[in-house]
Amino acid sequence: MALSDADMELYELARAASAHAHAPYSRFPVGAALRLRNGDVVTGVNVENASYGLTSCAERNAVFAAVGSGQVDFEAIAIHADAASAPPCGACRQVMTEFAPELRVIWRRDGEVVSAPLSQLLPERFVL
């Protein structure tokens, strides 16, 4: 899927957000930028904890911040980490699909910024 200028701007916001990540254990800072349909952008970063299971990913933190402010109409999310490939983890995919199964996901794969619909990354989502 071709990336628009708006998609690349969103990716750059995710890159900038990653500087605020709290990743003292993995040293793997991640930033996410979630664009809402109204054009607003909500960012999130990963926040690690010494009790590793309490760590929260950047994508989920962005989604939770948006939901907490009453915003649930998501258009796209960009994820940045200083790695050749950094797609969202399975837990983040499941959380995002709760709100936007066709969410446009932008991330770096093999050093190139790419995008795909969330339904392609999580074809068999869990639903009740």
Features from the language model and the residues they span:
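Short, compositionally biased leader-like segments
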Residues: 1-12, 72
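Short, surface-exposed loop/turn motifs that are enriched in glycine and acidic residues
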Residues: 3-4, 23, 51-52
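Short, basic/aromatic recognition patches
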Residues: 8-23
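Small-residue (primarily alanine) positions within well-ordered alpha-helices
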Residues: 14, 32-33, 62, 66
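Short linear motifs in intrinsically disordered
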Residues: 20-26, 93-98
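Short beta-strand scaffold segments in enzyme catalytic cores
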Residues: 27-36
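Zn2+-dependent cytidine deaminase-like catalytic core
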Residues: 43-128
